[in-house]
Amino acid sequence: DSKKVILFSHLHHDHIQGLGFNNDIFNPGCNIELSSALHESNELRSKIQTFFSGSYFPLNLTDKLKNLKFQNFFELVQNNKDDILIESLEMNHPGRSFGYSITHENKKFVYLSDNEFEHWQLTKLCDFCENSDIILWDGMFRDEDLIDKKGWGHSSIEQGAEFFKKVNCKKMLITHHAPARTDSELDKINSELPDGIELAFDGMTIEIN
């Protein structure tokens, strides 16, 4: 049997809606642990059950699917037997959210989505991302959008590019694109990004060598 882990940064709708349409959860031979640095396992289970049962979803996923297990984040980190180091850092986002760093065999991936970048975060973020292979950065906005979107909990593409200059990282992927941005607009943005930075897209896979 295989085991997979799903780490939730937070439970805003755009981060949980895909769970009920993930084919792996309906495979009884695939054991899946769900965890979050934001919620204890019982609270996480209760919230997921609310979203995926009753009026919101035809199946009660937490009761129906026996291959889904909820694990306290710090127990997941401590009990990990696969030589994988998982760390968390709180982001600047309404309702709270967490970023994650995952290191295995000296390869490091950092997830920093849903964060409204502020200068006071710089030192902690640099330390968190030091010697990383890939940073996944929240680039929902352009710099000119930031004034009107203060408090929305997201960063800009340009802020990501500036941060990339300050941290020891091989590659940055920009995610959480603004919903109104068209594919052609994203293609144009992608063509203008500095070396080492590109836009992430659905279905993208990256092999860290």
Positions of the model-derived regions?
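Binuclear metal-dependent hydrolase catalytic cores
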Residues: 1-110, 120, 125-126, 186-209
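Active-site glycine-centered loops adjacent to acidic/histidine catalytic or metal-binding residues
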Residues: 10, 114, 176
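Acidic active-site catalytic centers that drive phospho-/nucleotidyl reactions
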Residues: 14, 114, 138
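Structural motif
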Residues: 37, 112-114, 179
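Cap/insert and terminal regions of metallo-dependent hydrolase folds
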Residues: 117-204
